[in-house]
């Protein structure tokens, strides 16, 4: 009789083990607990399932934000300082990281400019003593100073 009433514990244990393997990155998939009753074990299983699914959604949201962050860094590496991270992670630390990185990009854009490739091209022209061209839509400090320098020379 006791084993009959405690048998749902095995299903709960299996479900929790699957969940812990998932959140510890041992597996990419997670299963929910099969709920066979509406007693205390069934209610506990349902509550655990809700949290498993919520955690899975949150981790997927965080993964998407990390992917977009990596893509944003690639865009910035190519010279475009207007790129920003727009995906919203769920993890508070990732939200803070996103905000700090976007603030850093705001500062770089304000102090340098929007297009590092255009700035580099103008500097190459200046090295060849060609001061005719200007940076279009200059707004960053380096861009504005570069245009002013070209005007003076």
Describe each PLM feature range.
Residues 3-152:
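Polar/charged heptad-repeat coiled-coil helices used as signal-transmission/dimerization stalks
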